[in-house]
C-alpha cells in the first residue's frame, strides 16, 4: 500500500489476488477480469471504493477484503461459496444479493452498513456473530434452512417482528439486542436461547 493508488485494472492472467495487496490506498475504481477466482484478506480494505462488479467466476472473498470503503451495494450472486469475516464491514451498503451456493454468512460480514432489508437465501444454515449488526434493518424473513444465529447477529437494527421456523436450533446471545421488536414467534423444539437475545427492545 502506498496511499496514492486511485484506479486499478486486474490483468486477465490473474486468478488470485493475495492478502493486503491494495490495502490502505485511495482506490475508487477497479476493473476485475472474468478469470479471477479468489480475493485475499484485506486486499481492498481501507480505500474509497463506491462500486464494484465482481466477476462471474469468483469463488472466495477473504476476511475484511472490502472493509472500510464507501460501497453502496454488494452483489454476491456469482459462483461465490465463501465470504470471509468482516468482508464488507464499515461501508454504506443499502442492498445486497446473495449467492445460492453460500451456506454460511460469517462473522461481521455486513456489520455497520445501511441495510434496510435483506433476502436471505434458502441455503443459509448459519449466520455468524454480528453479521448484520448496526444497520437499518426493518423487515426480516428467516429461511427454513437456518439452524444457528450467532452472537449479536442482528443487534442494533430496527426490526419489529421475527418468525422462526421449526429448524432453528440456537439463538445466540444479544442476537436481536437493541431493535424495535413487538412480536417474536419461537418454535417449541428450539434447543438454546442465550442471554439477552431479545433484550433492550422498545
Q: What is each residue range found by the language model?
A:
Residues 18-21, 40-43, 62-65, 84-87, ...:
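Consensus positions within tandem repeat domains that build extended binding/scaffold surfaces
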Residues 2-16, 26-38, 48-60, 70-82, ...:
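Structural signature of tandem-repeat unit edges
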